[in-house]
Amino acid sequence: MSAVAIKGWCPGALRPMQSGDGLVVRIRPRVGRLDAIQAVGIAELAARYGNGLIDLTSRGNLQIRGVSDAGYPALIDGLAELGLLDADSETEAQRNILVTPFWTAGDDTRPLAAELERALAGASLDLPTKFGFAIDDG
């Protein structure tokens, strides 16, 4: 039995983590939402460059596993075309926002999450690795 390696950080799209089956590429949907084009695009990218499966994390992110080093650049290009990448890995790591699944049209959840994302993108914060924000206006 092999020892478990604790990395001390979470993977992202721009900072993938090596695992036993290849790279783990984590996608953090903006404001906790995907449109239909993004959802289909992620499925196609997972089938082409990963193991074909998409994992849903406990914090509402998606991850594609089994990505090869050779396929990673094309996967990143595809995620960029879908509007799912941040400017850099530091911004990506800070944008860890969990949005209630019980939001309703017209409530403040989406505007609050969008404003928090904008504020985080321009900030240089020294947050703990697994620090996150949760938004529930109900």
Predicted region positions:
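Small-residue-enriched alpha-helical segments and adjacent helix-cap loops
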Residues: S2-A3, G22-D137
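Intrinsically disordered, low-complexity polar/charged tails and linkers
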Residues: M1-Q18, Q38
